[in-house]
Amino acid sequence: MNNEKRTTLYDFTIQTDGGSRGNPGPSAIGVIIKSSDGGLRKEYGEYIGITTNNDAEYQAVIFGLKKLKHLIGKEKAGHARIEVVTDSELLERQLNGHFKIQDPKIQQHFMELWNLKVDFGDVAYRHVYRENNKDADRMVNAALDKETNKLL
């Protein structure tokens, strides 16, 4: 299901993206954290080294959940309803239990996310088309461009 328009059922939305230039290649994550009341909006883009696109996608979700927990505190996190938005259909289907995970490294990320998820009231994963995830994608590309410029 890909429902681009939704009523606010969640306290926070975490838009995530991970990307690599080459697969594997130089990689980065982009994360946008927003509260439903508009009081919180944080943007992050970080270079994460040489890895695969799928690995970067998972690292973005892990980063986003950890960062949100840090921002709002453990007690508030325990009651918070979180929507994680990704343009990776593979990631969304794996996290929602529709696709098996073969790669051992991705299995480790899945387990880390499973353990992080229990720190929140509810975590839901939703796929959106790439054009609806431009902010997180922009953060990925900015981090990759910054790293590339360091090397020149």
Question: Which role does the model predict for each range below?
Answer:
Residues 57, 61:
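Short, conserved alpha-helix that lines the donor NDP-sugar binding/gating region
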Residues 1, 8-10, 42-45, 97, ...:
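Intrinsically disordered, low-complexity segments enriched in small/polar residues
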Residues 19-23, 62-151:
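RNase H catalytic domain
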